[in-house]
Amino acid sequence: MIWCLRLTILSLILSQGADGRRKPEVVSVVGRAGESAVLGCDLLPPAGRPPLHVIEWLRFGFLLPIFIQFGLYSPRIDPDYVGRVRLQTGASLQIEGLRVEDQGWYECRVLFLDQHSPEQDFANGSWVHLTVNSPPQFQETPPLVLEVKELEAVTLRCVALGSPQPYVTWKFRGQDLGKGQGQVQVRNGTLWIRRVERGSAGDYTCQASSTEGSVTHTTQLLVLGPPVIVVPPNNNTVNASQDVSLACRAEAYPANLTYSWFQDRINVFHISRLQSRVRILVDGSLWLQATQPDDAGHYTCVPSNGFPHPPSASAYLTVLYPAQVTVMPPETPLPIGMRGVIRCPVRANPPLLFVTWTKDGQALQLDKFPGWSLGPEGSLVIALGNEDALGEYSCTPYNSLGTAGSSPVTRVLLKAPPAFIDQPKEEYFQEVGRDLLIPCSARGDPPPIVSWAKVGRGLQGQAQVDSNNSLILRPLTKEAHGRWECSARNAVAHVTISTNVYVLGTSPHVVTNVSVVPLPKGANVSWEPGFDGGYLQRFSVWYTPLAKRPDRAHHDWVSLAVPMGATHLLVPGLQAYTQYQFSVLAQNKLGSGPFSEIVLSIPEGLPTTPAVPRLPPTEMPPPLSPPRGLVAVRTPRGVLLHWDPPELIPERLDGYILEGRQGSQGWEILDQGVAGTEIQLLVPGLIKDVLYEFRLVAFADSYVSDPSNIANISTSGLEVYPSRTQLPGLLPQPVLAGVVGGVCFLGVAVLVSILAACLMNRRRAARRHRKRLRQDPPLIFSPRGRSGPHSAPGSDSPDSVTKFKLQGSPVPSLRQSLLWGEPARPPSPHPDSPLGRGPLPLEPICRGPDGRFVMGPTVAPPQEKLCLERSEPRTSAKRLAQSLDCSSSSPSGVPQPLCITDISPVGQPPAAMPSPLPGPGPLLQYLSLPFFREMNVDGDWPPLEEPTPASPPDFMGSHPCPTSSFLPPPDSPPTNLRAVLPGTLMGVGVSSEPPYTALADWTLRERVLPGLLSAAPRGSLTSQSSGRGSASFLRPPSTAPSAGGSYLSPAPGDTSSWASGPERWPRREHVVTVSKRRNTSVDENYEWDSEFPGDMELLETWHPGLASSRAHPELEPELGVKTPEKSCLLNTTHAPGPEARCAALREEFLAFRRRRDATRARLPVCQQSISYPEQATLL
């Protein structure tokens, strides 16, 4: 700052001189502090009386002048200079009592009042610099006493002022610290200690010196911390029963010290045997009285003043005593048949010299017991435990100080040693990740303790032992591989057995015993392979030169593949007298194992023997030699090849050709455009986990060199594979097998898909075909013996149930063909063909009281047939309403004699021969099966066509009933009922009555059975009645013989009851099976018996029925409806139950029929069709 002011003043002065004015003079005045100095000023004229003027003294940095004198007036003085300044000899200023702060620039000015030119106001002035010299004085100092914690930093600062400026230095314990060193640094008068230690405590002196004098300041530094032991304890040796003292003294700040003593890390006051014999003195020493053998050991002194981490010092106390027995067991077990030891527990200091034994109170003579000897510690060793060892023993030990006495007596017992019950196998092979159980159990007396241990490096937390002492390795890991020992130990003996565990499916284990033999510019590396993990393993040798500089510790390793099966490798091309690191790596298909330990070796140099003189060559050397030193290196970027150029090059090297191969395959050219200037190349397109071999060939002009040395490299574990097309011909066999397998699988999958699609299409077509068949007209049964619809009715071929076959329905819909009196239609091959839409005949369908159907052949009259042909376009619902009923009932519901009207559409042949009355025909028996009780009343029924339709009588004409009845009249004498039953009429002679038809036979049974069954037991035969009808199954007539035989139950093998005899009523071409059931009962209790009662039951109920028969009253015709002329058969008595309900139903139907007939009578014949086909329910 001062020199800046000086430069400013000088610049002002120079600027004034540059204006052409008089150059002022600069005066320097030096004074000492406390003395006086005169600042000269000669601006006044030297002679004469000066004009009126004003004298001013200005100090640079002050706003106002420090001194102003005008004439004879009192001067104006600055307060800092009051009493210390005055004028002397003109305008000079005298300053008394100089101070350091008075130093600076002063200017003298004289203003003449008679001069009014403003340019000359400051012309009369001069500058004076006052320098005040003073001795050094401290402006800032550290405290006299400073406390600092140990390991903390501290700063001591000294600042001194003076003129000239003083120089500050520091001293510690009288030694100049200079600029400092280590933890102490001195800079610009400041002392800085980075880390205060115990030795940093002391006096630090700060000294400020200059030409005017020097000054000093001293600071005492106190370090707060744990104590420092200045007198540690020393090792000591005493005899037993003597006193001993161990010294310990420490220093610390603060000095509130507390001493503690420990024996073997236990406070001496916490040991019961020492509490009464130990003292700690004021100076920290330990006093121990009457020492004992147990007092020997390490004693530690620990002083403390409250700060953490107190110091400690230890010493060992040795106590000398005679040999003595510690604890002799009362019993000593020995193993039977094994080596045993009788121990004598002895302690002695000085050491033990010998031990004497007694057996059974007598001195033991070992020469009398072969195999007995003394152990190194005086124990008695018995080679074979037997009865000779039994007895009581005592021992007496001796050392240089003598003996403390004999031991108590111990009795020897013979015990069974541990013996293994379940021994592990010698070897175990198991896959990694699975569980392995190795049994091991032992017995003995006392029972032994079984334990497992792994030889070498053990497992932590992976091995478990179950309750049977078996070793469990769950899961099995790679670390479990090795040798395991099972040991059994008890008080008698200790036995072990071992086994080897081989863990399969892992990477190889580390190789062992790696050795390197140095060779000239090479090394021979050998090793012992580890376990291969269950797969074939291969090895590679890795080496690298040792880093010569620490800053380049990272370097690339070079690997060389080892031939398969070899356990050594010669590494060539090493630099002589250079230290190399070698390691061996094992690999298999699952990966790489750990590297072996690193071995260091220094290859040797070439021998210095003189070379043999070379003979003149007979052949010209090749003009181009091969590349040298080809090496493959694994780098983070991939596989990198290094090589040296050929030694012999003709003129210019054009390039290299890189060749490679896998294993023993042929050489392939990988790159033939490598530049001749290159000495390294990154090989692209390599495959993972493959062993490669590379070589180089150089070419120049027309010359091609021999191949270079082969460099081996494996890509196992390589993370980066340069992306390029795979090398030709180097596709691995596993990859090729996978590709071929994938293609084969794809082909098989496509073939199976095509076959499946074909099969699904065929199934779908079959389903559509079956669906069309279901949508086609329903199927009916037809006997096999009929060749066509025009077969003769008198065919001799029997029709059994096994000869029925399925045929297509000849009509589009059953409901359209169920018309009363519709003429027969020829069968049609297809429902949509015009030929298949013609009318078909439909016979009347009746239903008896038991709910079974009666079907009779009928043919519509000619005139009705013509009408039907004309009205064919009508809907089938109207034709369905045309129905016929052959039964009648009285209005009162009482059963009346049935009048059978001959409505058969088949006329009698012109020359029909009389024939016996046939038995029940096949259709009648078929309709009497329980199956037809399941048929839907309102279901569709197919038309039944006849071969030759004849002109039938009128549709509802009143025809006479057959003159001959099936049963004798009621008033006739009783005869053999079995002869008059329908089933027994086969043997009756020729009858002149009209031919027996199925309708007549069925009507007979409908009229006779209700009366008979009413008195029959409910449980007769096989009744399967239920609330809504019985569930029956279609089956042929029963072959079980009944009590007396009847037409209801034909004899076994009698198939004539189905279809036999020359004279039969026309057979039914079709029988429709109806699968849909519907409740047709009047109420919930409407039911039918599932079977007819037996013959004996019929005979029992037959006579009462005949006795109670009466004449059927004549029915009143209603609404012009024709009634039958005669009543036939017999009357039955009224029976409650189902018969009454049937009568009620019959009355309802008769009322409906009367209404229908009345309506039909009013209409023409061709228009008599029912408007409500749904009401045409067949009963």
UniProtKB/Swiss-Prot annotation:
<keyword id="KW-0217">Developmental protein</keyword>
<feature type="disulfide bond">
    <location>
        <begin position="344"/>
        <end position="395"/>
    </location>
</feature>
<dbReference type="InterPro" id="IPR013098">
    <property type="entry name" value="Ig_I-set"/>
</dbReference>
<feature type="compositionally biased region" description="Polar residues">
    <location>
        <begin position="884"/>
        <end position="893"/>
    </location>
</feature>
<comment type="function">
    <text>Functions in dendrite outgrowth and synapse maturation.</text>
</comment>
<dbReference type="GO" id="GO:0016358">
    <property type="term" value="P:dendrite development"/>
</dbReference>
<dbReference type="GO" id="GO:0030424">
    <property type="term" value="C:axon"/>
</dbReference>
<dbReference type="GO" id="GO:0060077">
    <property type="term" value="C:inhibitory synapse"/>
</dbReference>
<dbReference type="GO" id="GO:0050807">
    <property type="term" value="P:regulation of synapse organization"/>
</dbReference>
<feature type="region of interest" description="Disordered">
    <location>
        <begin position="869"/>
        <end position="895"/>
    </location>
</feature>
<dbReference type="InterPro" id="IPR013783">
    <property type="entry name" value="Ig-like_fold"/>
</dbReference>
<feature type="short sequence motif" description="PDZ-binding">
    <location>
        <begin position="1177"/>
        <end position="1179"/>
    </location>
</feature>
<feature type="region of interest" description="Disordered">
    <location>
        <begin position="819"/>
        <end position="846"/>
    </location>
</feature>
<keyword id="KW-0677">Repeat</keyword>
<feature type="topological domain" description="Cytoplasmic">
    <location>
        <begin position="756"/>
        <end position="1179"/>
    </location>
</feature>
<feature type="domain" description="Ig-like 1">
    <location>
        <begin position="24"/>
        <end position="124"/>
    </location>
</feature>
<dbReference type="GO" id="GO:0043005">
    <property type="term" value="C:neuron projection"/>
</dbReference>
<keyword id="KW-0524">Neurogenesis</keyword>
<feature type="disulfide bond">
    <location>
        <begin position="158"/>
        <end position="206"/>
    </location>
</feature>
<dbReference type="GO" id="GO:0030425">
    <property type="term" value="C:dendrite"/>
</dbReference>
<dbReference type="Pfam" id="PF13927">
    <property type="entry name" value="Ig_3"/>
</dbReference>
<dbReference type="GO" id="GO:0098632">
    <property type="term" value="F:cell-cell adhesion mediator activity"/>
</dbReference>
<keyword id="KW-1003">Cell membrane</keyword>
<feature type="region of interest" description="Disordered">
    <location>
        <begin position="766"/>
        <end position="807"/>
    </location>
</feature>
<feature type="glycosylation site" description="N-linked (GlcNAc...) asparagine">
    <location>
        <position position="513"/>
    </location>
</feature>
<feature type="domain" description="Ig-like 4">
    <location>
        <begin position="322"/>
        <end position="410"/>
    </location>
</feature>
<dbReference type="GO" id="GO:0098978">
    <property type="term" value="C:glutamatergic synapse"/>
</dbReference>
<dbReference type="InterPro" id="IPR051170">
    <property type="entry name" value="Neural/epithelial_adhesion"/>
</dbReference>
<comment type="similarity">
    <text>Belongs to the immunoglobulin superfamily. Turtle family.</text>
</comment>
<feature type="disulfide bond">
    <location>
        <begin position="41"/>
        <end position="108"/>
    </location>
</feature>
<dbReference type="InterPro" id="IPR036179">
    <property type="entry name" value="Ig-like_dom_sf"/>
</dbReference>
<keyword id="KW-1015">Disulfide bond</keyword>
<dbReference type="GO" id="GO:0007156">
    <property type="term" value="P:homophilic cell adhesion via plasma membrane adhesion molecules"/>
</dbReference>
<keyword id="KW-0770">Synapse</keyword>
<keyword id="KW-0732">Signal</keyword>
<keyword id="KW-0812">Transmembrane</keyword>
<feature type="topological domain" description="Extracellular">
    <location>
        <begin position="21"/>
        <end position="734"/>
    </location>
</feature>
<dbReference type="GO" id="GO:0098839">
    <property type="term" value="C:postsynaptic density membrane"/>
</dbReference>
<feature type="domain" description="Fibronectin type-III 2">
    <location>
        <begin position="623"/>
        <end position="718"/>
    </location>
</feature>
<keyword id="KW-0325">Glycoprotein</keyword>
<keyword id="KW-0393">Immunoglobulin domain</keyword>
<dbReference type="InterPro" id="IPR003961">
    <property type="entry name" value="FN3_dom"/>
</dbReference>
